[in-house]
């Protein structure tokens, strides 16, 4: 299949970076991370109008619903288990060993994230409705949230690994019959009808959000449905009752996921992925392996709180688009209104992280 940059001037300098996508997919082919084969990259605009690359077509299943309905509990459990193992394999890839040492900054990921989202939220809150002139306004507890997240003494240990940026079940392609990941994708756009459970034009192998960053950002994104399931559906979006404790047979708990993830991420990577001297990645993984489990639990709580805050900020952005009449659908309205409940929930998680003694999250349900 061919993936090309859209014609014309792009609003975002980082969007549709097909050259970057090719680079990481091609590099990961040397590892045990399941990615499609990238055959060639053409940066000559005269061929098809914009740069493009050609890659392998993945013929498999995509589960739009992360609960994975209509399968047996054992299959559901195995699907989630391989997704978790796949993420851990990605995170244990040393960027130097595959030529991606310049793919992003190796330190300071969460500090940059906090600064970026503070700036974005400030701009979004100042947007005024074109008719009422009422400002969108800040998120609840915004100043306190920013103060907490910016406090380096509260942040997780600074780590730098390859991260996907939007890792979740519906961004993966699974084997047609086996509970096995055959490729990592990224959600690009939504079609109005439901496609069959195979790779369609609803999913394209984009890695636009990938960089070098803290691996906790990916693992917290993967388990987000477990946390948002606690919310009132009338005040939020994407509240999936199937992720409530014991609601779905075969679905792992967050603790199950964390345990499997760290068991794989902390293991030594394959020999062809290990440089001659220890990298910062290897050292941080070794440090994580030896860390007090209570510290690890605290870091996971911090990362989840930040991820929920980020969702609130995204919904605030949709509210700003509504105010400027750049969006008008009912779905957009619901997302815009969800910013309040998500920000309140992020604040609850922050308070829990502050007072936590390091206990795990979620003890109910089946084991991987």
Task: Describe the function of each predicted region.
Residues 162-164, 169:
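Catalytic-loop of the protein kinase fold
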Residues 199, 217-272, 277-288, 306-325:
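Active-site activation/catalytic loop segments of kinase-like enzymes and analogous catalytic loops
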Residues 313-368:
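Regulatory N- and C-terminal appendages and interdomain linkers associated
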Residues 31-35, 92-103, 126-131, 155-156, ...:
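Surface-exposed helix-capping loop/turn segments at secondary-structure junctions
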Residues 1-162, 175-180:
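ATP-binding pocket architecture of kinase catalytic cores
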Residues 18, 302-305:
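Start-of-helix signal in alpha-solenoid helical-repeat scaffolds, especially tetratricopeptide repeats
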Residues 53-56, 85-88, 115, 119, ...:
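Generic alpha-helical structural context detector
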Residues 173-197, 201-233:
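Catalytic activation segment of kinase domains across protein kinase-like and atypical kinase folds
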